[in-house]
A protein has these predicted regions:
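Short, low-complexity disordered leader/linker segments with a strong preference
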Residues: 1-56, 368-370
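Short, polar/charged alpha-helical segment
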Residues: 26-30, 44-55, 65-86, 168
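Extracytoplasmic ligand-binding site segments that recognize negatively charged/polar headgroups
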Residues: 61-76, 88-104, 110-247
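Periplasmic-binding protein-like
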Residues: 164, 192-201, 222-226, 231-233, 237, 304-328, ...
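A bilobed periplasmic-binding-protein/Venus flytrap-type ligand-binding module shared by bacterial periplasmic
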Residues: 169-174, 210-212, 282-297, 305, ...
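Extracellular/periplasmic bilobal clamshell ligand-binding domains
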Residues: 328-370
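A ligand-binding cleft/hinge motif common to bilobed small-molecule-binding domains
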Residues: 122-126, 249-269
Length: 370
């Protein structure tokens, strides 16, 4: 008899528990909707309704910060998933292009774009021209299948679809094994002084150390690095090519994905170093444009890029780029088990301040043209 009662109680719990959980989830969504509405934000509570509205919209126009092959691959994958949508994408990754589009918006020029690439340091300037859709809450409530940390918790509507891992490059034929740096302090050794080291005048890579080391430490380090009398450069691809050709031996603070791309293309003398704490920054930030005619389709596309399929496309095609916040992504795997200096949203918003202070610590250098 006791066994029968226990079974009946267990069955009763199993039937009631899902209802209670659903009620709890529903209450959470209702509360999120109230909070969003109080801030003037829209929050869709049903993914099926988003899809139904996207079917009526039928298309999507986006200015994306990815390379063209990636854009094509994402477009094809998105169309396969949602065959009723006809997307039109254009490459928009150049900072000058982003600034020019912002000036057009500020001048009152009308736009038919639904999604735009936004520079991290330009988020405040773009804020007035973004659609007030609470993507963060929709991700937290499971309406959109997006890792919530990919979305800015302050603006609620800007998403970082990728992360950049800052690394070090060297030519293995030119740099002896015993001089290969193992720590950040190793770059300050006499062996690397006197124009034996490339350093970018734009200090975004060294700024990536601030979250782990603190701004004061990084400013001091920047002054010591400048005292090494490096070759000051601007940009990476041209100098990585020169390094692969045997012109330089060591590049401080370049991009992991940039070095790996070149190795894939045959630059086998190049090697990449991941030094802890590893600077990782949120990049490929995008938002839905204010007044977008196809906001529901825009939400579905951002969700698609944030998905495992979209992240794999970026790693394979971009290549070597994905979000550290995407579980199981290659970037998350690369960072796993290492001490990370994570430039999260709080630090991303302070990036302009870091850049200004570190440029001063460098001594306001200029690129040394040949």
């Amino acid at each position: 008899m006791k066994i029968l009662v226990a079974i009946l109680l267990a069955l009763a719990y199993c039937s009631v528990a899902p209802v209670a959980q659903a009620g709890s989830a529903g209450a959470g969504l209702m509360q999120a909707q109230k909070e969003a509405e109080a801030k003037g934000f829209r929050l869709e509570g049903n993914r099926e309704e988003i899809i139904a509205k996207a079917k009526k919209e039928g298309g999507l126009r986006a200015l994306l910060g990815f390379d063209k092959p990636t854009i094509v691959a994402l477009r094809d994958g998105f169309r396969k998933k949602y065959p009723f949508i006809n997307p039109h994408f254009e490459e928009h990754g150049n900072p000058a292009e982003s600034q020019r589009y912002l000036l057009e918006l500020q001048a009152g020029r009308t736009s038919d774009w639904d999604i735009v690439n936004v520079l991290n340091e330009g988020q405040y300037e773009y804020a007035s021209y973004t659609e007030k859709i609470d993507l963060r809450a929709m991700a937290e409530q499971g309406v959109l299948q997006i890792p919530p940390k990919m979305i800015n918790p302050e603006s609620r509507n800007v998403i970082a679809l990728s992360s950049t891992v800052d690394a070090v490059a060297y030519n293995k034929k030119l740099l002896p094994p015993d001089l290969v740096p193992k720590t950040w302090d190793d770059f300050l050794k006499p062996a690397h002084s006197g124009r034996k080291l490339l350093v970018d005048i734009r200090p975004n890579s060294i700024a990536g150390l601030v979250p782990a080391m603190g701004l004061e430490w990084v400013e001091s380090y920047a002054r010591k690095l400048a005292a090494q009398q490096p070759v000051w450069v601007r940009g990476h691809t041209r100098y990585l090519n020169a390094m692969a050709a045997g012109e330089y031996r060591l590049f401080f603070g370049t991009y992991y994905h940039g070095v790996m791309r070149m190795k894939n293309r045959g630059a086998q003398d190049l090697e990449v170093l991941i030094i802890e704490p590893v600077p990782v920054r949120l990049t490929e930030t995008h938002t839905i444009v204010k007044g977008a005619r196809r906001p529901n389709t825009a939400m579905l596309f951002l969700e698609y890029v944030a998905s495992a399929e979209g992240q794999k496309i970026m790693w394979d095609v971009e290549p070597f780029k994905s979000s550290i916040y995407s579980p199981g992504s290659k970037t998350e795997e690369l960072a796993r088990g290492k001490k990370i200096s994570l430039g999260d949203w709080e630090h991303a918003m302070k990036q302009p301040v870091y850049m200004e202070k570190l440029t001063a610590a460098f001594g306001f250098p200029r690129e040394e043209k040949k």
